[in-house]
Amino acid sequence: MIRKSDETPIGRVVATELKPATPHQFHFWTATDTSIGIGSIVKVQGSGVGDQVSGRIVYGVVTDGFAYSDLATPLHDVIGAEGDPAQAAERPTARAEIRLWTAAVLRQIPEEPLQPVPLGAVHVAGDADVAAALRMDGYLNTAQPTAIPVGLYESGGLEAPVYLDADFLLGPEAAHLNISGVSGLATKTSAVEFLLSSIFEHYPAHRGSVAAVCFNVKGPDLLFLDQAGTLDDADRRRYARLGIEPGPFERVHYFAPFKADGVNLNTLRTNAELARTVEPLVWGLIEVLDFAEVLLNRDDIDAKADAFIDFLSDRVVRREFDDGFGGEHRVETFADLERLFRSIFDGLEMASRGDIWRTHHIATIRKVRNRLGNVSTRCKGLVTDDGPASDLPWGRFDDRGVYVIDVANVDPLGQDLVFARVVSKLREHLERRDLGVDAVVVFVDELNKYAPADGVDTYVKKMLLDISERGRYLGLVLFGAEQFRSQVHRRVVGNAGTQVFGRMDSDELATPGYQVLSPATKIKLATLPVGELMVRHPHFTQPIFVRFPRPSVLRGRDGVERFPPAADLPFADAVGLQLVRLDPRVRTNQVKDLIAGHDEVDVRRALAAVRRERPADVLAMLRKRLGVRVGSEPARERSSVQPLGPIAEEPY
């Protein structure tokens, strides 16, 4: 239902020599009991002489307010009451009081010629006025609308839907969203959850398909998006007003690395009712070698080491390779790489050929060997020494699907690796247009940590900068959140076409980036209630306050209470649970009997192969794989790697 503005004026524009009306700002007075407040949208109807003045309509948003009386100085009021406040309240004649408001211009119709705001009556804006003031009519009431509901503008009993333009939110005209606010009170995660549900329901069909990849970096924040939350009547009314059907996300896919034991998942979503929906995230040498820059200390790796790593990536990995000493190798895992290194060192020692192999000095080779050999130890559970990988479904992304990667309990090095590889793979597939969807929203919280304004340029920071500057052309959209916007890299927040602010810290509002806001607007930002946001969008010439309904998904802390995480299982039980996820017909006792007496390393390899191939008969394949090396080559005799002897000239 479209609600029209009240034809009864609530105020009138005034212009004096000290406070004139300009093309971008005007002042108006109202009665003292008005419903107008900071953030209210008003409409001015020109009533002067001439067609341009009488037909001109101006929309504005209130940015400040003042109250006046006829007092020239406070001393007069004190003397009039004889210094007694009680007598002032009993005076027979009340002093005249005026409410004066300052408003910033949102839009003028016609837009040319641009002139000062005319003197005229001021009205409260209705639904159609809000749409016109925010220029939403250009993408809302068209043959192919691109409007995405972001919330409700509320003022004086009016609830008017506010929409964002999908072309400026998800590209190609502009893209990216950034949301700032204090932790816990700004509802940043809730706002992103609601906006994703709005995008999934209202993203125009002619723009193609869309999915979301969310990195869970804090506790259980994003671990229950497939579970329904609790809504009250006010939330349901807001959903209906915005044209959104409340409910949890229908296609949610969860991924998490293993813990150090290699069988228990490193996530809080381990309750028996939900654990089957979490897929392992495990990578090997092939997956991580291209991201050696993330894993290795750049102060410790020089150009020679970089050149040798590139040689391994281009000439050795996944190829039949002759080490020059009569040995044939096919390197696909860290264990294979260790065997190659051992062959090189033994060959050089036996052949007495000095300290150069394929133009690379032995000290450089030892250095790279030591650094790469530590990767699987430092990222244990995420990176495997020997075994197949378990990855996201590249090329098979679902339309309106949400892919949650839980790295909340992963060490910082592992988090950096996950961010770098996942986003890089997204970009590669979007460039080739074979991801399965046309656009992807990447949600990253804690930008203060991953893209700080100061400090060294890490791989993750450079990756986020690349998304914010060039991602919109590919359909790769960054939704970022942080507590302190002033401490995030300027190019990351500056390239966000849509900027959202929740409740802000007063110290943050005192930084130079907020000087464009009026003092009254800053005060409102510092005291915003939960569920209210200030939104800046390319179509909005001024920030607008909106209220959004509570997300219709289970909040993280409520989800942990309803679905308490299970304790880590013993090795055999954890293996059984992994197989039950693949085939509910499997019984844990069968698995225990099958793996009894086998080495845990062999069981992990066999389990990884079963997860990768997902056969019809899970137990039969596990039985076949046990005791057989899982990989691309036949089983070899297992030999322990002897420690390298010290070398006098070894500088590392």
Identify the role of each PLM range:
Residues 531-597, 601-610, 632-652:
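Conserved P-loop NTPase motor module
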Residues 1-182, 190, 195-198, 202-209, ...:
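Basic- and hydrophobic-enriched, low-structure N-terminal and domain-boundary segments
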Residues 153-253, 490, 535, 567-568:
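Glycine-rich phosphate-binding loop of nucleotide-binding enzymes
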Residues 177-178, 405, 479:
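Conserved beta-strand position immediately N-terminal to the Walker
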